[in-house]
């Protein structure tokens, strides 16, 4: 706290005080009076401007050219206030001595908000010398500007109200605009409905002509429309609609029974006219086309053949008869994921984002519907099949969707190879190559009967290798594969292979030479 204790006395001079302090007075009483006046003025100025606690003798001056962080007096300061670097005590007293004991302070106070701004202003306030109160309790300016500094809570509430007004004012205007727009739209809609109703009610009358006053219909007018029908309806409704004929072209009022009778007459007339037209058409046809027995037999046999099976050969690669897919020798089915990074990453956790083809086993079922096929990635793949029983393979059938109903024929297989494995062999042997054509029928059978001598025993496993397709770079579709052959008998000798034929030929040649 501030006291009137002299500072420029003997003790300070003995402790190495600045020489400029000695010029404040010749003796201790004068020094005491001068330093007390100076401290009171400077203390009052500092507390009024920047709300700092009082000091004993001097305060550090704030200049606009030098910047320094605000001193920490354990009070709450706003973070947006910037303070300048203050002068030391010695520099302050040197300036005081040079300026003739006039305490002046240059204050530079800024803020980013709506706070007040003070730049290079001098404040000199009178001091009641007879008062022994503290420096900050002397005569102070009670204007609104100084009051805001003495009471920072008022200034904070002002800033808070300004903040809320600046934030919520656009929302308020937006709400008013929206309400006005909705009100205008509602009024226009109601006005349109009112105008349409008034226009429909006055459609028969021009807008510029007065509406005539039509008197209400009297009972005499109502009964004059058709008095006999009204009389019959009121006396006995069952009598109305007898066998008498009605003139319905006059536009008179009729009952429901009369209308039903008229409608029935019209329907009978239409039926009669239709029968006459059909009889005239039959009489105009000169003769009927009659087929002989040969043509009938040919058509029936052809239809029966294609209704049962167009190939008419046993299929040993049918899933329902015991054939199986060899997963280790079969390519993976086609899987398509999104191309973007985030959906592609998400597709590994959510299967709904992935497009997957059918399993390879669908190629062993007789289903020729569109898209009911086994699809694999790219244009090359293979399908390993374990036949339902060991056979001598003679034919292979490749089936694709009908060309007339296919969406895209570029995914059909083109070149393929057939590899086979005997019952006691561990190696697969190439049985032959072929090409599926798009210009021929959708079900094409290829013969491999001339290559049976390559394998000497019945075949259990086959591999169909697709080498290319008809232009689709993404996937290839295979609808159905059929493997045909002959079943070996129990006492039948196995067909000699090409190697066995060479060995037997060499043995016969050796016996002849001996």
Curated annotation (Swiss-Prot):
Pfam families: Sad1_UNC (PF07738). GO terms for biological process: cell division; centromere clustering at the mitotic interphase nuclear envelope; meiotic attachment of telomeric heterochromatin to spindle pole body; mitotic spindle pole body insertion into the nuclear envelope. Residues 198-219 have a biased composition (Low complexity). Residues 322-488 form the SUN domain. One of its GO terms (cellular component) is meiotic spindle pole. Residues 505-514 have a biased composition (Polar residues). It is a single-pass membrane protein. Keywords: Cell cycle, Cell division, Cytoplasm, Cytoskeleton, Membrane, Microtubule, Mitosis, Nucleus, Phosphoprotein, Transmembrane, Transmembrane helix. The chain crosses the membrane at residues 168-188. The modification Phosphoserine is found at residue 236. Its main location: cytoplasm. One of its GO terms (molecular function) is spindle pole body-nuclear membrane anchor activity. It is found in: Cytoplasm, Cytoskeleton, Microtubule organizing center, Spindle pole body; Nucleus membrane. Residues 1-27, 198-228, 490-514 are annotated as: Disordered. Interacts with bqt1. The bqt1-bqt2-sad1 complex binds rap1. Also interacts with cdc31. This is Spindle pole body-associated protein sad1. The gene is sad1.
């Amino acid at each position: 706290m501030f006291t009137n204790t002299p500072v420029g006395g003997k003790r300070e001079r003995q402790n190495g005080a600045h020489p400029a302090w000695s010029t404040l007075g010749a003796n201790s009483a004068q020094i005491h009076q001068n330093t007390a006046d100076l401290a009171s003025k400077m203390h009052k100025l500092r507390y009024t401007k920047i709300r700092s606690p009082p000091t004993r003798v001097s305060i550090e001056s704030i200049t606009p050219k030098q910047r320094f962080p605000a001193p920490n007096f354990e009070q709450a300061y706003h973070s947006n206030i910037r303070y300048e670097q203050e002068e030391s005590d010695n520099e302050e007293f040197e300036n005081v001595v040079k300026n003739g004991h006039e305490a002046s302070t240059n204050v530079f106070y800024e803020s980013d908000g709506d706070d007040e701004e003070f730049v290079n202003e001098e404040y000199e306030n009178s001091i009641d010398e007879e008062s022994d109160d503290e420096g900050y309790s002397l005569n102070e300016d009670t204007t609104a500007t100084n009051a805001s500094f003495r009471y920072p809570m008022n200034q904070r509430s002002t800033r808070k109200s300004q903040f809320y007004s600046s934030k919520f004012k656009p929302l308020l205007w937006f709400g008013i605009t929206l309400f006005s727009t909705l009100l205008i739209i509602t009024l226009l809609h109601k006005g349109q409905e009112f105008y349409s109703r008034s226009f429909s009610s006055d459609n028969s009358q021009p807008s510029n002509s007065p509406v005539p006053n039509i008197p209400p219909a009297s009972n005499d007018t109502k009964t004059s429309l058709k008095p006999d029908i009204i009389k019959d309806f009121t006396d006995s409704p069952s009598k109305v609609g007898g066998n008498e004929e009605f003139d319905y072209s006059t536009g008179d009022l009729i009952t429901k029974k009369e209308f039903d009778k008229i409608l029935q007459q019209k329907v009978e007339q239409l039926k009669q006219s239709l029968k006459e037209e059909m009889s005239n058409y039959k009489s105009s046809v000169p003769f009927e086309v009659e087929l002989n027995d040969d043509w009938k037999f040919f058509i029936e046999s052809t239809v029966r053949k294609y209704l049962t099976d167009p190939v008419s050969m046993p299929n040993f690669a049918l899933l329902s008869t015991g054939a199986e897919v060899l997963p280790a020798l079969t390519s993976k089915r086609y899987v398509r994921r999104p191309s973007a990074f985030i959906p592609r990453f998400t597709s590994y956790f959510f299967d709904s984002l992935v497009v997957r083809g059918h399993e390879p086993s669908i190629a062993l079922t007789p289903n020729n519907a569109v898209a009911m096929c086994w699809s694999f990635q790219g244009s090359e793949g293979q399908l390993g099949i374990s036949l339902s029983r060991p056979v001598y393979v003679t034919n292979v059938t490749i089936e694709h969707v009908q060309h007339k109903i296919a969406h895209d024929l570029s995914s059909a297989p083109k070149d393929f190879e057939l590899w086979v494995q005997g019952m006691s062999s561990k190696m697969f042997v190439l049985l032959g190559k072929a090409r599926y054509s798009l210009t021929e029928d959708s079900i094409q059978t290829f013969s491999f009967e001339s290559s049976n001598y390559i394998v000497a025993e019945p075949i259990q496993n086959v591999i169909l290798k697709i080498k290319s397709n008809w232009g689709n770079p993404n996937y290839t579709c295979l609808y159905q594969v059929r493997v045909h052959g002959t079943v070996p008998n129990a006492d039948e000798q196995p067909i000699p292979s090409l190697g066995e034929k060479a060995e037997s030929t060499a043995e016969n040649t050796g016996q002849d030479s001996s």
